């Protein structure tokens, strides 16, 4: 699922390359999905939370389509817990916002505001700058 036709085309190529079946490509907004409530056992959102206009609305929509007790996995950049890096992110966030990216998104605040319990956090990617976050949907 993506809004970008180019990203959907890339997904189609990967589906073909890996011979995947039972995979649908859907063009829609992750903050307003057409799926019924409780449609999925697990929802994975990679590199989305920091580029949507309203991260809270996005998380609420993910919770809506994930069944109670289901897993929600975020792979995203979140504001650093290192005070020096966090300050740099705060100072540069205006520039990043102009490019459509929020460098100052706080993981703990986002999850708390949306009543998501974090089960596990792992640092991933280059220099561990991104995080893989596993939550349980306790709606």
Regions found by a protein language model. Give the residues of each.
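Class I SAM-dependent methyltransferase SAM/SAH-binding core
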Residues: 1-32
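Conserved Rossmann-like nucleotide-binding pocket used by diverse enzymes
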Residues: 26, 44, 73
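A short SAM/SAH-binding and catalytic strip from SAM-dependent methyltransferases
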Residues: 41-54
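Short N-terminal helix/helix-N-cap motif within the alpha/beta-hydrolase-1
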Residues: 6, 53-57
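C-terminal alpha-helical "lid/dimerization" subdomain adjacent to the S-adenosyl-L-methionine
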Residues: 73-130
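C-terminal lobe and adjacent flexible extensions of AdoMet/dcAdoMet transferase-like proteins
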Residues: 132-139
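A short glycine-rich, Lys/Arg-flanked "PGG" loop and its adjoining helix->strand segment in the class I
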Residues: 56-68
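A short acidic, Gly/Pro-enriched loop at the edge of an enzyme's catalytic core
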Residues: 28-43
């Amino acid at each position: 699922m993506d809004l970008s036709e180019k990203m959907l085309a890339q997904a189609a190529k990967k589906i073909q390359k890996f011979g995947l079946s039972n995979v649908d490509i859907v063009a829609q907004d992750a903050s307003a999905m057409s799926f019924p409530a409780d449609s999925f056992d697990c929802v994975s959102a990679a590199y989305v939370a920091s580029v949507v206009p309203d991260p809270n609305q996005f998380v609420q929509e993910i919770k809506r389509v994930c069944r109670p007790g289901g897993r929600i996995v975020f792979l995203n950049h979140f504001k650093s817990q290192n005070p020096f890096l966090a300050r740099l992110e705060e100072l540069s966030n205006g520039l990043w916002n102009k490019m459509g990216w929020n460098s100052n998104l706080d993981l703990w605040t986002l999850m708390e505001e949306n009543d998501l319990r974090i089960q596990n956090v792992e640092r991933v990617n280059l220099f561990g700058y991104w995080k893989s976050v596993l939550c349980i949907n306790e709606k």
